[in-house]
Amino acid sequence: MRLDQIEEPEKVQEIKARFFREAESAGRLSHPNIVTIYDAGEQDELGYIAMELVEGQSLKDWSRKPNLLPLPEVVQTLASVADALDYAHQQGIVHRDIKPANIMITKDRLVKVMDFGIAKMASSSRTQTDVVLGTPTYMSPEQIAGKKVDGRADVFALGIVLFELLTGQPPFAADNLSALLFAIAHHPHPEVQTLRPDLPPLLQEIVNRALQKELPQRYRRAGELAQDLRACLHSLAA
């Protein structure tokens, strides 16, 4: 990242702080399903992050028809993502931008969560209230409202990813950004079984619980989501 080419010099420090926050947060994480950050620094006005080289494809490549993954692979993959998020949340870190493009499947079929670029360290004194960060399609209602978020925002985003990988379309869509954000915050998500009648009831329940707008009704931890996904995977193999 060229720090000397930022058009508004007064924003350099803010951008630098956000850039190095990725290294600070992700550098604390050591998990087989999270891309490893090795180093970060600044040299000759160039900010850099050295990270694990991941060769493979992102889930974005398999989020639209006719390229949808087989059902068992979808469930297994997102269970691994949920494991990674549960670990990060236990370290006090919320990803805040979970989406198919940030989930890689390597050539060896390993799942890797990447890009903690807007991750929020729960212990940080810098408030995120009234600051909306993330990719709009995958934002939780509390992110849209600018409220303080925790790991349940990542659970909601992972629920959207699950819906998308199962159906080939996101649960919320609109003609403009304002309408999209309003839909996520206020409209019920479509029932996934209307688009995929072949899905087992347990998987439908998992999608519904992950996409609950009210926090008390949503999965409390990503680990609970991973557990239910593996129970579903077991039932598929039975």
Task: Identify what each model region corresponds to.
Residues 214-215:
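Short helix/strand-capping hinge loops at secondary-structure junctions
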Residues 218:
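Conserved HRD-motif arginine in the catalytic loop of eukaryotic-like protein kinases
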Residues 198-211:
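Conserved C-terminal C-lobe helix
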Residues 229:
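Hydrophobic "lid"/C-terminal helical patch
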Residues 1-190, 233:
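Conserved ATP-binding/catalytic core of the eukaryotic-like protein kinase fold
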